[in-house]
Structures are given as structure tokens and as C-alpha cells.
Amino acid sequence: GTEYIVCAQKGLRMRKKPDIRGEYMQMLPDGAVITVLEEQAGWFKTTYKGYTGWVSAEYCCKATGND
């Protein structure tokens, strides 16, 4: 998958579904590096610290690296 960095000063909520009403799972800190597994309607599916869920793509910046 593509790597992104969480760009949300207050952190980014991971949810069970790609929906703002989806059940809250955990908070991803600002600057966390995530790998996007799937993309759906402005949401990214990712795994972080053993949890797999959805985060808002709006608060993710593409990681710049050696591509």
C-alpha cells in the first residue's frame, strides 16, 4: 500500500467503518506513519498497533520518500 503520515495536531480517530458514525477504536497520533490498504469515499483502511480500521483521508498527508 501507499504510505501516508497523519497530519492532525490533535490526532486522528480510527473507526470500525468508513463512516463518521463508525465505532471509535483508537487515536492515531500526529506524525504517525500508516500504510493504506484500501480507499473508500474519503476514508483510508489501515492497520496501526494491531488494530485495523478506517481513518479520514482528509487528515493524511502523502509520505515523501524514495519512490
Predicted regions and their residues:
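SH3/SH3-like beta-barrel fold
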Residues: 31, 44-48
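A short macromolecule-binding patch
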Residues: 49-60
